[in-house]
Amino acid sequence: MSGALEGIMVVALEQAVAAPVATVRLADAGARVIKLERPEGDFSRSYDDCVFGQSTYFVWINRGKESCRVDLKKPDDLALVARMLAKADIFVQNLAPGATKRLGLGSKELRKRHPRLIVCDISGYTAGTSMHERKAYDLLIQAETGLAFVTGSEGSGANRVGISISDVATGHAAYEAVLEALLLRARTGQGSHIQISLFDTIADFMNVPYLTRRYGGREPRRLGLAHPSIAPYGVFHFADGDIVIAVQSEGEWKILCEDVLNDARLGRDPRFDSNVKRTRNREALDTTLQAQFNGKTMDEITARLDKARIAYGRISTVGDLMNHASASTLPVETPEGIAEVLAPPAIVDGKRPKLGRVPALGEHDATLRKEFAP
């Protein structure tokens, strides 16, 4: 597959979600990705069986890779991996902390032997901290970072974000860091050692509630489908469905009142004449606006919102997403048939990438063992 990273070779000692997210983006960009799997396979292969008997996770984040089974307890297989790494540009791994070092594949040893190699270690908790050795999974990180605490409604208690955001975001952070390391290597000729943790990734995303608590002295509230710092920016109910409406400036607030609600006086109400006041008086604001919307249809209001150029979004089901006007899908070949997946976001020179094939377990064992034979 051609692309910006054509000619780049990646060895991925990976499992589950975070590292495969990083390497599938590298594969989409044209890199050759060799996925090393335990003899029984990456356990994400058995998360579910929704796609022709195959896992949704595995189909999504393992396209364009070569699958090679290795048993790292066997010296011959460990030597095979070492020979692959001798020719690799990038090594991505998310085994348990310390596992690669015990195998002789730690970053210090590898970069001593291969100075141009970029090593990316993905862990649950931050390297060098007391929690680094702990096991960590997506939901645990959502809980530990406070993300679960700020997610949900006032009466719901802490909630999980609806997707595996810790894993997915960490994979993207690793992908970005690897690309930066490739650019640096082009200038210096030297590889890099990258350490990325799920905790650091989500903690970085938590900076707004963190700064609110640290410097504003306020523990952020769970607001459900509402923005904690902007109002009105939340869900309103109509006769035939729900819509999130977003007002981003004082000018838009006046336009909403005058052109959508036909109520210029509301725009001058001293309780609501600045964003700070509107967020402070959010309950009264939402009650006032909801009273204006009661009995009206979504089409009636969205026509006014479109004309006034006020942003909104309908509350969609996943079924709605399947038929959404903005949704793009691409075909992916799997061992059990062609699946349609939602497309990666980048459109380059008017084109979406061509996605590679999802490998069967050990599909490339023979060819890779021959290619990297001693």
Task: Mark where each language-model region is.
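Oxidoreductase and adenylate-handling cofactor-binding alpha/beta cores
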Residues: 171-191, 204-214, 258-262, 267
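Conserved Rossmann-fold dehydrogenase catalytic segment
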Residues: 127, 155-163, 186-202, 221-228, ...
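N-terminal helix-loop segment corresponding to the beta1-alpha1 unit
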Residues: 1-187, 334, 360, 364-374
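Glycine-rich beta-alpha junction loops
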Residues: 40, 124-126, 198-203, 240-242, ...
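Flexible glycine/proline-enriched surface loops and loop-helix/loop-strand junctions
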Residues: 156-165, 237-241, 350-352
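Terminal low-complexity tails and localization/encapsulation signals of metabolic enzymes
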Residues: 1-9, 221, 237-238, 316-374
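Short, well-structured beta-strand/strand-turn elements
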Residues: 33, 306-321
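Aromatic-enriched alpha-helical interface/lid elements that frame and gate functional surfaces
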Residues: 231-308, 312
